Amino acid sequence: MSEFQKLVIIDAKGHLMGRLASTVAKQLLAGQKVVVVRCEELNISGHFFRNKLKYLAYLRKACRYNPSRGAFHFRAPSRIFTKAVRGMLPHKTTRGNIALKNLQALEGIPPPFDKQKRLVVPAALRVLRLKPSRKYCTIGRLSSEVGWKYKNIVSKLEERRKIKSAAFYQAKSANQKHINVAKTKSSVNEKLAVFGY
């Protein structure tokens, strides 16, 4: 993401949440519009049980005499990621608020973005940043165990999308093979050159 683009779509699968959030926050402050898809596949370092206990303790933080006043805790992976990014932005200022509005976090890869190019952030990838022996867990599992109800729906939709994209890729690669074969046939090219092609 060294150059400015109209819209950056990041595939969050296999990224560490905090590291990805810091990179995204930096881009948002620079004026970039960012869409983060597959937030349920984000990773958090540390054992799952430890992270669950920490999150349950976080959910208990509320106003004693009127819990409806706040603090408000989100269960959906996209909202958890958005709140992580918000903590890295000056969201109470106009500049920070505008930056936060340029972020869109989603579970799965919904239709407008499934046919567009998606990027990864090498500085935030778990395989490059975490020791192989270290424990980690996904936000999708954590969210589903603390109250997120849509894990099954998102996984079904993702399975459908993967089947469609695999079929599209096979058709595209078969078409590309024909193009490559056509390019290598020199006799045909010589005949076409006679006619000015």
Curated annotation (Swiss-Prot):
Superkingdom of origin: Eukaryota
Principal location: cytoplasm
Pfam families cross-referenced by the UniProt entry: Ribosomal_L13
Signal peptide stretch: none
SUPFAM superfamilies documented for this protein: Ribosomal protein L13
Other comment: There are 3 genes for uL13 in S.pombe.
Role description: Component of the ribosome, a large ribonucleoprotein complex responsible for the synthesis of proteins in the cell. The small ribosomal subunit (SSU) binds messenger RNAs (mRNAs) and translates the encoded message by selecting cognate aminoacyl-transfer RNA (tRNA) molecules. The large subunit (LSU) contains the ribosomal catalytic site termed the peptidyl transferase center (PTC), which catalyzes the formation of peptide bonds, thereby polymerizing the amino acids delivered by tRNAs into a polypeptide chain.
Subunit details: Component of the large ribosomal subunit (LSU). Mature yeast ribosomes consist of a small (40S) and a large (60S) subunit. The 40S small subunit contains 1 molecule of ribosomal RNA (18S rRNA) and at least 33 different proteins. The large 60S subunit contains 3 rRNA molecules (25S, 5.8S and 5S rRNA) and at least 46 different proteins.
Protein name: Large ribosomal subunit protein uL13C
Organism of derivation: Schizosaccharomyces pombe (strain 972 / ATCC 24843)
Species lineage: Eukaryota, Fungi, Dikarya, Ascomycota, Taphrinomycotina
